[in-house]
Each structure stands twice: as structure tokens, then as C-alpha cells.
Amino acid sequence: MPRCRWLSLILLTIPLALVARKDPKKNETGVLRKLKPVNASNANVKQCLWFAMQEYNKESEDKYVFLVVKTLQAQLQVTNLLEYLIDVEIARSDCRKPLSTNEICAIQENSKLKRKLSCSFLVGALPWNGEFTVMEKKCEDA
């Protein structure tokens, strides 16, 4: 009986693998499910946004850490990864880099230091493996 289950499982995954395989001509991964809205409170969305902000703050040359003010929308696309497109509003905080683990940050209130940005992050994830990659990042002044 277990042998039949394994055979069934293998036969079911073959079509999925064929659909998700890379097209060598286009060098793109097949889309299994196009972008669809997903709740911003979804655990995977939160993990992806946390990761994207860690990367943003690491790469940013700003002396201050940026925080998410508001999540505008989140969408999910399924390829060989779970791809989350997350639109957020971020702002400069009152915490300087590098951030210590026990520091509590608030949005910058000083008018000379205030700065808000609208950002879109495309994060590829295999959350069950703890794998996250910022595939695209676009930020502009809000």
C-alpha cells in the first residue's frame, strides 16, 4: 500500500515540475499562479517584509534605521518560489545604525530629519526552509 502512495505522489508531481521548470529560451521560471492579493497580516508576508526591511537598512547609506509605517498591499505569485510583492510606506526612525537588539525605535519627529518613502519589495521565499531573497526593490520619496 505505501508503494502505491509513493507512485501516486511521484506521478502527481511530474506535471507540476514540468509547468514550473525554467524556459531556457526566455530564462524565466514558469508562473504557476499569477499575482493575487493576500492579507498583509499573513505570517509569510510579515516574514518577507521583515527580511526586506533588514536588507533595505543594511544597504541604505542613511545613518538612521527605517521602519514600516503602513503596509499598502501585498500580493502573492507562485513560481518555483512563493513571490510576495509588498507595497509599503516606510519612514526614518530615531534609531541610529547599527541597531542594538534591545533598542526601541519610533518614527523621526524632528522636521529636519523626517523622511518618508513609498517602497515596493518583491521577495522570493521558501519560508518552510527559512530562505528569503529580495528580488526587486524600488523606493521613492512619498
Curated annotation (Swiss-Prot):
<keyword id="KW-1015">Disulfide bond</keyword>
<dbReference type="InterPro" id="IPR052691">
    <property type="entry name" value="Sperm_Mat_Cystatin"/>
</dbReference>
<comment type="function">
    <text>Performs a specialized role during sperm development and maturation.</text>
</comment>
<dbReference type="GO" id="GO:0005737">
    <property type="term" value="C:cytoplasm"/>
</dbReference>
<keyword id="KW-0964">Secreted</keyword>
<dbReference type="GO" id="GO:0009986">
    <property type="term" value="C:cell surface"/>
</dbReference>
<feature type="short sequence motif" description="Secondary area of contact">
    <location>
        <begin position="77"/>
        <end position="81"/>
    </location>
</feature>
<feature type="glycosylation site" description="N-linked (GlcNAc...) asparagine">
    <location>
        <position position="27"/>
    </location>
</feature>
<dbReference type="InterPro" id="IPR046350">
    <property type="entry name" value="Cystatin_sf"/>
</dbReference>
<feature type="disulfide bond">
    <location>
        <begin position="119"/>
        <end position="139"/>
    </location>
</feature>
<keyword id="KW-0325">Glycoprotein</keyword>
<feature type="disulfide bond">
    <location>
        <begin position="95"/>
        <end position="105"/>
    </location>
</feature>
<dbReference type="GO" id="GO:0005576">
    <property type="term" value="C:extracellular region"/>
</dbReference>
<feature type="signal peptide">
    <location>
        <begin position="1"/>
        <end position="21"/>
    </location>
</feature>
<dbReference type="Pfam" id="PF00031">
    <property type="entry name" value="Cystatin"/>
</dbReference>
<feature type="glycosylation site" description="N-linked (GlcNAc...) asparagine">
    <location>
        <position position="39"/>
    </location>
</feature>
<keyword id="KW-0646">Protease inhibitor</keyword>
<comment type="similarity">
    <text>Belongs to the cystatin family.</text>
</comment>
<keyword id="KW-0789">Thiol protease inhibitor</keyword>
<keyword id="KW-0732">Signal</keyword>
<dbReference type="InterPro" id="IPR000010">
    <property type="entry name" value="Cystatin_dom"/>
</dbReference>
<protein>
    <recommendedName>
        <fullName>Cystatin-8</fullName>
    </recommendedName>
</protein>
<dbReference type="GO" id="GO:0004869">
    <property type="term" value="F:cysteine-type endopeptidase inhibitor activity"/>
</dbReference>
